[in-house]
A protein has these predicted regions:
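Internal intein/HINT superfamily modules and their associated LAGLIDADG
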Residues: 1-228
Length: 228
């Protein structure tokens, strides 16, 4: 569709190919694109009860260690809102005492979450290293509200906010896990957003490592953390 003065138009492919881009006079050698398609509406999901609150699971997948039987999450202590994040995690658990404060290592506070070992094991997540993490199908097909909370938990940890100077803010997510990245991209699209995927391989600490990234553009703010 082409958009002129906030009006949607339906155009055939032949017409689009003729003038879909024009030269950018303010930046020689680059182009501006004349057409765009509107964001879709979110896809309805299932209202099946989830074993772990979606925000908590998102936070664990984003910044947690689940290679052992008890998940550990870390929250940066150089952010003013880290106590608020811990309080939010506690509010989403059946018992706030399940969150135990641990030590502070290199500017990050570590917390151990008790009582979720069985649930994580049933979801196939216990024992997963960073490169093996994934979003369980049950959560990908859950309700719109649950998917939004899951995405918020993921982005509140490893998400990066787009520039505030841009009219259309595009956030990004980076992970060592291709499966987790793919799941996040699916989440964004199922919520009516746009997401593109890419990857980058670098030589670091004596070996090659690959980061899997996706861009995120939504009609709403997907973050819950204030500083984001």
């Amino acid at each position: 569709s082409g958009k002129t003065k906030d009006r949607l138009r339906t155009l055939d492919t032949e017409t689009l190919l003729k003038d879909y881009k024009v030269e950018n006079k303010t930046a020689p050698g680059t182009f501006k694109y004349r057409y765009s398609t509107p964001l879709t509406v979110p896809i309805e999901g299932n209202y099946t009860k989830l074993p772990i609150h979606p925000y908590v699971l998102g936070f664990i997948l984003g910044d947690g260690c689940i290679s052992g039987n008890r998940p550990t999450v870390r929250v940066s202590t150089n952010r003013e809102d880290w106590p608020e994040i811990v309080d939010r995690l506690r509010s989403y658990l059946p018992d706030p005492n399940l969150v135990h404060e641990g030590t502070e290592v290199r500017g990050a506070k570590h917390f151990r979450i008790h009582g979720l070992g069985k649930e994580l094991k049933d979801l196939g997540l216990i024992g997963c290293k960073s490169k093996d993490k994934f979003i369980p199908e049950l959560y990908l097909k859950s309700s719109i509200e649950n998917r939004r909370l899951l995405l918020a938990g993921l982005l509140d940890t490893d998400g990066c906010v787009g520039s505030k100077k841009k009219i259309s803010k595009v956030s990004t997510y980076s992970s060592k896990s291709e499966h987790l990245r793919d799941g996040i991209s699916y989440l964004v699209r199922s919520l009516g957003g746009l997401s593109t995927k890419n990857e980058s391989t670098r030589f670091k600490y004596g070996r090659y490592t690959t980061s899997y990234m996706c861009s995120i553009r939504l009609a709403f703010n997907p973050f819950l953390r204030k500083y984001k």
